[in-house]
Amino acid sequence: MNTSLTQLCFWALQILLMSNLLLWEDVVSVPTIGSGSGVSEMLTEDLFDDAIILSQHINSLAIETRRIFLSNNFSSDMFITFTLQFNRHDEFVVNGLNSCHTLPLKSPKTEKEAKRISLPDFMNMILSILRAWDNPLHHMETELKSMPGAPFAILARVKDIEVKNKILLDRIMKIAKKVKYGFEENEVYPAWSELASLQSANEESRFFALYKLSYCLFVDTDKVEHYLKHLKCRYFDGYMCQDSVNQINLL
């Protein structure tokens, strides 16, 4: 009786060991990250999602910055005046806001136009927009620090945008290296040339430079967000476009 029980336990233990061995072989046989196209595609989708979420956050910060400029005692009088002049089609203000320094990039205005641009060129256009803001964001923060009464809420957001803009640039470069499609980095980007206005002794000129920067920053951060969604949609052959999170609304 005892011998039979011992044998039964022995065989049960053998079966358990064999089961564990087979399970372990199944685990180690799973492809490592990047070894299969399916896993690689998942990782690329995650990179796109991270970049899009970050671009949305930057765009929200740009909107908040403009809202504070329009409502804070430091700048509201000047900003409201410029807004009223724009609504009255004042030539100086309208021309100013229609000449953001990234205008030479000739960004697509419709989805149809965007589809005519190759994926590598589209990627470089997004990178150029981000690089074009390095210098103006730095000077915007520097000059605001020197202006009496400049609220911390604006300074903090401009600094946050500057830092996150660099992070987003790095993340998009990682996507570019994975996407490839003949991608060759083009480090040419539009130069910002209005530092003199931002440093002007004339208060109106100085505040209009800030007004224009805050407006163009909002426009370009919004573009980057929507362009990344468009890029993701095209990279995954369009099936992502039906997702409400990735709806495209090009400016």
UniProtKB/Swiss-Prot annotation:
Disulfide bonds join 100-216, 233-241. This is Prolactin-7B1. Belongs to the somatotropin/prolactin family. It holds the Pfam family Hormone_1. Expression restricted to placenta. Abundantly expressed in trophoblast cells of the junctional zone and trophoblasts migrating into the mesometrial decidua. Glycans are attached at residues 2, 73. The keyword Glycoprotein applies. Residues 1-29 form the signal peptide. Keywords: Disulfide bond, Glycoprotein, Hormone, Secreted, Signal. The gene is Prl7b1. GO terms for cellular component: extracellular region. It is found in: Secreted. The keyword Protein transport does not apply. Gene3D superfamilies: 1.20.1250.10. CDD domains: prolactin_like. InterPro entries: 4_helix_cytokine-like_core, Somatotropin/Prolactin, Somatotropin_CS. It comes from Mus musculus.
